[in-house]
């Protein structure tokens, strides 16, 4: 600790000291609040609203509003906010992250800033990780808000459009991060302002903020539609990977690395990548030629075969890096992704880039079509749009730097209401998995015999089922809580604190539900209270009996040492390990935790296995004897820090690339919204039309050029064939030899204006305006979709620019900007061409066309939180080479040579120029 910190205290201590003053103010108001009748207390809400409407600052009413909310909670929920919860509430109100331990009452704490900020009438979003928690918290806390005169809504995926609008128009809206993000994207795809559901993004309180803003920040939200069908190709390519062999070892430029066993491909588990060797390329080409997929003598890297190599790599990754019951499960003839952080099934989500189809081919299930992106956004860019953002979690301090760097959110560690009594024991490291599971079984048996509840955290469904099998053989009753049955997870977790309870849970399944020592009787009490057949006296007696039974069980568990946590493997993030430990020792309860590891575990095998194995061999450790030493724990923590730093780099790089698309997204969505809100777009259409025809004219009649350079015949032909305008500029020049080019352009614009007005006259200005708006929206949407695909292709190959001494990020920004300019020109051309060439006979035709345009965008739509594949550090997102960084300081020089139509496109996509940027040029 530095001298300055000792004198002035840390930033955290200074903030807490500042908030303590306000806590004293709130506590001083408590006696006065207790004296108020229910009606007088409820009348405070409209009073606060009025004061805010008159211009009073929201911070000035904070002490009084918090005091009102606390008093209302005492009366309605029979729960009083602790002082530390008041501090947490202030932390959230000031747009920071509150780190509070498990069981410290984050849900209740959030009511304070939510109530205060909802008084503005602009809406507050409370964001949770799943629908169950959103529904539970909205019902639970909604009674408090309702009593105080505020409305509460729940935004879930299965509710209809009208219900969503009601939810968003409530003062407080609970929902999941995915649903809030998808609603934003959907709102920017509507064809009528009345179809929007969201209001302006004012204030969001994010529960489990580390899970949402960090773990899921590498996976963009994507709305997609079906692209062309490659089912047959996936099936054929699926036969190739089993014919290829893995190469062990790899030659390195420094000569240290050597090939131990030659093979056709190399696998890098750390980077989650597979690469073909030279021999592998040749072998794959021979196999594909025999299959008839590759022409005789052709190369996989020919421009015409670019889709073939894309499919081959997808199949290789599916076979070598993605494993059943670890990365996915097969259910109802479908491949369902397993969330690597929570172990939950991510139903409806699909890996992108053809990987999901490759896994489907591998498993022999029905292959669903590839998708085309219609709209996408990352959580980073979505949540940064809120005027004020706050979050709460039990574990944020390890990621405080990232929260500050990416979101500008400061992390405040809130002191515990009662001191933590949990004992975190030293890791035990075994040579093999068998020894590790044997030691865990002994520990679980010991706890079971003493009546101590155990929660075992696993990193995959496969491990949880393996451990379940071991416990079944030992005749130990237990519950398995994994992604295959998460509907029951809250119920199982709530009872995981009963004596002798053994619960196996994948990672953080059941997060958000407290484990109460002795079990949770709240649900049974609710059933008794809801039973109208019982008198009040009988209800009280039965509830009392339940309470006494619970107290007895609670005391029994406390005497046995509280909840014991067993970790079967260290996660690559220290935070996830801390979350598992944090399930024990809530509210000052006793508890303990221990991680059992083996050298076969993924993290140890990849990062620290050789070092630890060398230590064990040197010490001549006997079979079944663990290492329990600080040096090993430090090695593991060092490995975790490396992975965390790498993952942070990936997220930061992803954000820097997505910021380019985000700036463009804002422009497109803003223009789209202006279009929706404009009733008559004829002025805009006129401006576009005149611009397009002026550009067309200048292509054939350059400014300040001689008459000999004009190509009026070609221009006349294009006007007649492409634009259906029967007007000859060549004839005009022949009739008036002295006419200037400016006068000719003016004449052309008069003719096009007249053709346009003739169309409008057939159906009337009002009807045609709706059609024009529909055409513009449809053109913006379709070209934006194509642009997103072009950006994806650009990003996939951009890392190669590092080898040409160029900074890939700068190159990406420059080319993305050029593509955006080309897209805007394409939109203008498409709109003007449609409006000028459409044939209209009646108003009914125009109404039908308008309806068709509005419907075109909603067919075959899928919603994915597309797995960006967080483990794969894509080369394009990692700093390519040292040369690239040197190139960053060099001025940008356009050195692009003249490209032939059939040459590979210089953007790096691998396509022919005429099929890529040449199509846009």
Curated annotation (Swiss-Prot):
Co-factor binding details: May bind 1 zinc ion per subunit.
Catalytic reaction equation(s): ATP + H2O + cellular proteinSide 1 = ADP + phosphate + cellular proteinSide 2
Molecular function, one GO term: protein-exporting ATPase activity
Segment forming the signal sequence: none
Entry cofactors: Zn(2+)
InterPro entries: Helicase_ATP-bd, Helicase_C-like, P-loop_NTPase, SEC_C_motif, SecA, SecA_CS, SecA_DEAD, SecA_motor_DEAD
Cellular component per GO, a single term: cytosol
UniProt record, GO biological process: intracellular protein transmembrane transport; protein import; protein targeting; protein transport by the Sec complex
Main function: Part of the Sec protein translocase complex. Interacts with the SecYEG preprotein conducting channel. Has a central role in coupling the hydrolysis of ATP to the transfer of proteins into and across the cell membrane, serving both as a receptor for the preprotein-SecB complex and as an ATP-driven molecular motor driving the stepwise translocation of polypeptide chains across the membrane.
UniProt subunit comment: Monomer and homodimer. Part of the essential Sec protein translocation apparatus which comprises SecA, SecYEG and auxiliary proteins SecDF-YajC and YidC.
HAMAP family with a match to the protein in the record: SecA
UniProt record similarity statement: Belongs to the SecA family.
Name the record gives this protein: Protein translocase subunit SecA
The species this protein was found in: Herminiimonas arsenicoxydans
Lineage: Bacteria, Pseudomonadati, Pseudomonadota, Betaproteobacteria, Burkholderiales
